[in-house]
């Protein structure tokens, strides 16, 4: 083999296909997957952050700050909860997150306890208590957002799909005063029916 085919993407760019020629050491881009109507300069880079939860456990998260957000121009925010429950939010490109950020919302994609990618102990920390400690991790993510000087601390919601949608509904049900709004994207709301299917 003289050539390697690979995909490369970032939080600001969907994956593209490249070919690397090992002889000439040339990297050639074969695709351009970003819609040409989207200005790449409008997209925001993901920033990995960590914050302490209610019990001191360090929670990893990915922060997306709108370009025009500042101390003088505070923006509303959403706590983003991934599916799973053993899924993981990563720094790769998300068209929905970029859309929300470009419409003025800061996003904190929380990797609450039970998320994959942080070892077996972290992964098993939400076993037998879904919607409890993992939800508290999301609430403490909200507290982290409130401490940022560019966030409108009174306007923070929660959003998620699949298990993240369940967490959204758990937040709205068990802690109704924590979040201003909840957006359930195809989340589980009937565990008995889900477990039977």
Name every feature range the model reports, one short phrase each.
Residues 2-197:
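Serine-hydrolase catalytic core recognition
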